[in-house]
């Protein structure tokens, strides 16, 4: 039986949570479907595709700032859209896909346009909470088109952004799957040895708070730094791990701001930059609390943390909060209430058995 062909849009060259999910989807469906990916450039994503023998086409830079979009960004997106739709139509004519699949946020409207012009069914996979009103309006408009057959949302709070009545009928909420075994049996020892070497001290009795994700403003690593500083001022011996790295020049500027903030707070010996890592299971095993301060549709990191029997602290307006209500594994703080953030983390660190579904002691106690 001939496999159906799927053309996949990905707008990042790296591999973060969304790209992990795209790769997982392709892995799970590889026996029934063939895939071809549209990606911006060579990088971590292209390396993963090569491992799977999945063909890809380079589309050029598709980087846009997160959050509310100004006029300059809107004009840039308009020009970027023209170029990408034109090039994508060329790929469609050559590859002849049966289905267009768009998990990359910038590519959602492009796939709807291409699906309409090429008469191909489109599936959207929404991972994000869109902070920009213009973006929400555009997605509700395009989501109503006949070419968009299904809209998969990773959480209810993501799906609820599609308010157009006809478009909302296409929404199906499917929580992202996670390989529990991959994260449930990590080796904490080697990470602790690495941290002790970097910090030049033993970590027995020290609590570790970890944030995982690309270093960028919408991930809010600045909140983690504030939490570590606040806990230090409260007399807590805590180390913060920043797992991930920068992608764009704006990200690199943000990281420099974070480094200056760390210097100003006097906590250089309490923050460890871990960079991009593949041994997340081991890092989680060495962690007491996973911190998710970003407003995301559904944090894959939170799911991985729960698989590793680690508690999660997140704010009360994210997909991770929705997940927390189901799993009961951790606690939350009020959005924009700075005083409650450190208290939430402190509560988790002081009550390691508060996790309703899982209990696991600190690897250093």
Question: Locations of the language-model features?
Answer:
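Carbohydrate-associated surface elements
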Residues: 157, 177
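Short, structured helix-loop element that forms part of the nucleotide-activated donor/catalytic region
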Residues: 44-50, 241-268
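Conserved small/polar residues in nucleotide/adenosyl-binding loops
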Residues: 358-365
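Short His-centered aromatic/hydrophobic patch
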Residues: 84, 102-108, 126
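Conserved donor-binding/catalytic core segment of Leloir-type glycosyltransferases
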Residues: 6-7, 202-219, 225-228, 241
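Short hydrophobic beta-strand element within catalytic cores of glycosyltransferases
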Residues: 311-314
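Conserved acidic donor-binding segment of nucleotide-sugar-dependent glycosyltransferases
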Residues: 292, 326-327, 331-338, 347-353
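Active-site donor-binding acidic/aromatic loop of nucleotide-activated sugar
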Residues: 249-255, 268-276, 283, 295, ...
């Amino acid at each position: 039986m001939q496999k159906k062909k799927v053309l996949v849009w990905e707008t990042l060259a790296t591999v973060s949570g969304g790209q992990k999910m795209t790769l997982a989807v392709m892995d799970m469906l590889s026996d029934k479907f063939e895939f071809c990916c549209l990606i911006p450039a060579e990088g971590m994503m292209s390396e993963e595709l090569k491992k799977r023998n999945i063909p890809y086409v380079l589309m050029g830079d598709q980087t846009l700032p997160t959050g509310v979009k100004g006029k300059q960004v809107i004009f840039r997106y308009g020009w970027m859209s023209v170029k990408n739709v034109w090039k994508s139509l060329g790929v469609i004519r050559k590859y002849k896909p049966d289905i267009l699949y768009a998990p990359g946020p910038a590519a959602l409207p492009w796939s709807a346009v291409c699906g309409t012009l090429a008469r191909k069914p489109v599936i959207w996979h929404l991972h994000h909470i869109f902070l920009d009103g213009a973006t929400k309006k555009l997605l509700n408009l395009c989501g109503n088109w006949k070419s968009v057959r299904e809209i998969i949302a990773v959480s209810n709070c993501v799906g609820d952004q599609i308010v157009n009545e006809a478009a909302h009928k296409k929404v199906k909420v499917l929580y992202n799957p996670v390989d529990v075994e991959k994260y449930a049996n990590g080796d904490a020892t080697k990470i602790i040895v690495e941290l002790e070497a970097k910090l030049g001290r033993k970590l027995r009795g020290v609590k570790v708070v970890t944030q995982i994700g690309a270093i960028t403003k919408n991930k809010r690593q600045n909140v983690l730094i504030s939490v570590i500083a606040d806990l230090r001022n409260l007399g807590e011996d805590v180390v913060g791990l920043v797992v991930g790295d920068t992608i764009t020049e704006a990200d690199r500027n943000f990281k420099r701001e974070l480094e200056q903030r760390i210097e100003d707070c006097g906590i250089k010996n309490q923050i460890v930059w871990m960079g991009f890592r593949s041994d997340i299971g081991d890092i989680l095993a060495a962690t007491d609390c996973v911190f998710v301060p970003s407003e995301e549709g559904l944090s894959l990191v939170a799911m991985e943390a729960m698989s590793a029997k680690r508690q999660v602290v997140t704010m009360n307006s994210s997909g991770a909060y929705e997940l927390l209500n189901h799993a009961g594994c951790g606690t939350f703080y009020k959005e924009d209430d700075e005083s409650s953030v450190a208290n939430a983390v402190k509560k988790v660190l002081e009550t390691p058995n508060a996790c309703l579904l899982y209990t696991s002691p600190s690897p250093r106690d």
